[in-house]
Curated annotation (Swiss-Prot):
The gene is gpmI. This is 2,3-bisphosphoglycerate-independent phosphoglycerate mutase. Catalyzes the interconversion of 2-phosphoglycerate and 3-phosphoglycerate. It comes from Escherichia coli O139:H28 (strain E24377A / ETEC). GO terms for biological process: glucose catabolic process; glycolytic process. It catalyses: (2R)-2-phosphoglycerate = (2R)-3-phosphoglycerate. Pathway: Carbohydrate degradation; glycolysis; pyruvate from D-glyceraldehyde 3-phosphate: step 3/5.
Length: 514
């Protein structure tokens, strides 16, 4: 009979940051007797989850993708945002063979160069500075027909903040004397990640057919009309931008289409609609054979050009477990499943030997403030069963509530989400202690602790750059180390498990066994 394993469990409370100020702080306002008691009585520390400590630009807020890559890698992983900033600054970007090749090919054939992406200074899925550099690259290489298709943010940025970005690009095109913003649409449609194909179809039709629900002469006018309809940036309906006498910007065979998002999860669906011959998410009214370039690799099975292919990470936590014949479980809801699998494994899609995965469906609601507990009860039930099963050496779990409900900007809902999490943590901690296992509770970045923007008075729907908690629950006598960061978590887990830390992991253990 095999011996029951005592698992090392990592619970990631997505969007659960630490903030001393109590105003507009859903985590402080919520009744959290369990987390309060753990913080008071167990070894704990605060760790950095943003900026240079996670490979992002200085003071840049953290995000789930970046957070999980650092958590799993055990070393600071320089993110695409930072890498692209450097490439643009030293002008290597302007010589990227994939980007220049696509532009030159379209230009030489008299075709258009279409640039699409999230027009945002948020830096989570994209950055407008990168899009600006792409416009400049196309113009410098002599492209005449340059069309920008702007997906509007309002989620990683304030809800109504797109106007200054659109103005900047309209001014740029005016200065160049060519090109224009050809369409605007909210990210709710263009960047779905939950197979809501009816949304993606609206964006696809706007791009391929130059057909939308609305039309305006300029991008700013189109945005102002959306605000008048009470649509915030994220939800702006498909709007064609085309003044009298301007050519139609519908996509044609042979055009170049460059997708400037660098984060994969919300880029995949619309990319598949363009690239996959066997695409069946919706019946495409127009199938165009464009020269499609992904800025980064959105998925290994999407067969199209990639401007910046992934650098592979060796000996991530998951791979190291497999090499040491350990069993592991990854478990989360739909919204964060990719994060505890693909991203935690350093961008590797397939599971490692001995790695099981459990996916709990996120509730099908329009926005998560309508169901702030999400699917946490079912997730907890499955997680507790796995802890007690004796099957796993380690378990990685993500609860999405703090982040997904924090993004709605609805304070009361975020408070309910945090209270639901407190009940879940109680169940998990009890289960871990009952089998003699160990538990680390942390977060990948902040969100719910800051629900209103003090500067603008608007709802604060974005992540924060605040530290996150790290708590140890277990029978070892440990002392916490200050000054940690997300990439210290994997080495911390390995040291608590009594395992060797691979040399590729440069993070340091944050709990020292006394």
């Amino acid at each position: 009979m095999s011996v029951s394993k005592k698992p090392m469990v990592l619970v990631i409370l997505d969007g659960y940051g630490y903030r001393e100020e109590q105003q507009d702080n859903a985590i402080f306002s919520a009744k959290t007797p369990v987390m309060d008691a753990l913080w008071a009585n167990r070894p704990h520390t605060l760790i950095d989850a943003s900026g240079l400590e996670v490979g992002l630009p200085d003071r840049q807020m953290g995000n789930s993708e970046v957070g999980h890559v650092n958590l799993g890698a055990g070393r600071i992983v320089y993110q695409d945002l930072t890498r692209l900033d450097v490439e643009i600054k030293d002008r290597a970007f302007f010589a990227n063979p994939v980007l220049t090749g696509a532009v030159d090919k379209a230009k030489n054939a008299g075709k258009a160069v279409h640039i699409m992406g999230l027009l945002s200074a948020g830096g989570v899925h994209s950055h407008e500075d990168h899009i600006m550099a792409m416009v400049e690259l196309a113009a410098e290489r002599g492209a005449e027909k340059i069309y920008l298709h702007a997906f509007l943010d309002g989620r990683d940025t304030p809800p109504r903040s797109a106007e200054s970005s659109l103005k900047k690009f309209e001014e740029k095109f005016a200065a160049l004397g060519k090109g224009r913003v050809a369409s605007i649409i909210g990210r709710y449609y263009a960047m779905d990640r939950d197979n809501r194909w009816d949304r993606v179809e609206k964006a696809y039709d706007l791009l391929t057919l130059a057909q939308g629900e609305f039309q305006a002469d300029t991008a700013v006018a189109g945005l102002q009309a959306a605000y008048a309809r009470d649509e915030n940036d994220e939800f702006v309906k498909a709007t064609v931008i085309r003044a009298e006498g301007q050519p139609d910007a519908a996509m044609e065979d042979g055009d170049a289409l460059i997708f400037m998002n660098f984060r994969a999860d919300r880029a995949r669906e619309i990319t598949r609609a363009f690239v996959n011959a066997d695409f069946d998410g919706f019946a495409r009214k127009k199938v165009v054979n464009v020269d499609f370039v992904m800025l980064t690799e959105y998925a290994a099975d999407i067969k199209t050009a990639v401007a910046y292919p992934p650098a592979s990470l060796v000996n991530t936590f998951g791979e190291w477990m497999a090499k040491n014949d350990k069993t592991q479980l990854r478990i989360s809801e739909t919204e964060k499943y990719a994060h505890v699998t693909f991203f935690f494994n350093g961008g590797v899609e397939e599971s490692f030997k001995g790695e099981d995965r459990i996916l709990i469906n996120s509730p099908k609601v329009a926005t998560y403030d309508l169901q702030p507990e999400m699917s946490s009860a079912e997730l907890t039930e499955k997680l507790v069963a796995a802890i007690k099963s004796g099957k796993y050496d380690t378990i990685i779990c993500n609860y999405p509530n703090g982040d997904m409900v924090g993004h709605t900007g609805v304070m009361e809902a975020a408070v309910k989400a945090v209270e639901a999490l407190d009940h879940c943590v109680e169940e998990v901690a009890k289960a871990v202690e009952s089998v003699g296992g160990q538990l680390l509770i942390t977060a990948d970045h902040g969100n719910a602790e800051q629900m209103r923007d003090p500067a603008t008075g608007q709802a604060h729907t974005a992540h924060t750059n605040l530290p996150v908690p790290l708590i140890y629950v277990g029978d070892k006598n440990v002392k916490a180390v200050a000054g940690g960061k997300l990439s210290d978590i994997a080495p911390t887990m390995l040291s608590l498990m009594g395992m060797e830390i691979p040399q590729e992991m440069t993070g340091k253990p944050l709990f020292i066994v006394e």
